[in-house]
């Protein structure tokens, strides 16, 4: 029997991860501002909070609090996936989570980095600098 492909004019619904990443990518170039969650400036947890709000996942506006939610990912033995939240230490206090970004692959993330910086895509921190990885989607 001959199989014919059925084409549809309706585009596929983007995955929840794609919705989060598309929102985060749209913020690239906007300035970092402590305590802000958009629409014109963000701090690190404000960016993750707003991106995940697009898929009805509610996150607190603090990286340490966000790091206690979702499912833990063992980043040393399994790959970080797009949509995972990646948490790092402060350079000032090596025992305190103080930064978060959204992985877009196993090697890159989107982050609102620091005062004077802008939302950007950059290389994921090395495994030794990562303190937690959490999966929400």
Residue ranges and their predicted role:
Residues 13-16, 36, 40, 93, ...:
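Residue-level signature of the cytosolic catalytic core of signaling kinases
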């Amino acid at each position: 029997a001959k199989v014919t492909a059925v084409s549809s004019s309706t585009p596929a619904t983007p995955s929840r991860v794609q919705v989060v990443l598309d929102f985060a990518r749209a913020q690239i170039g906007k300035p970092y501002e402590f305590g802000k969650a958009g629409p014109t400036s963000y701090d690190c947890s404000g960016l993750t909070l707003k991106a995940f709000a697009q898929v009805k996942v509610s996150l607190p506006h603090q990286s340490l609090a966000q790091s206690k939610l979702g499912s833990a990912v063992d980043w040393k033995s399994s790959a970080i996936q797009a949509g995972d939240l990646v948490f790092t230490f402060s350079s000032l206090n090596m025992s305190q989570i103080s930064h978060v970004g959204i992985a877009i692959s196993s090697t890159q993330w989107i982050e609102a980095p620091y005062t004077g910086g802008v939302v950007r895509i950059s290389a994921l921190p090395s495994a030794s600098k990562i303190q937690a990885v959490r999966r929400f989607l």
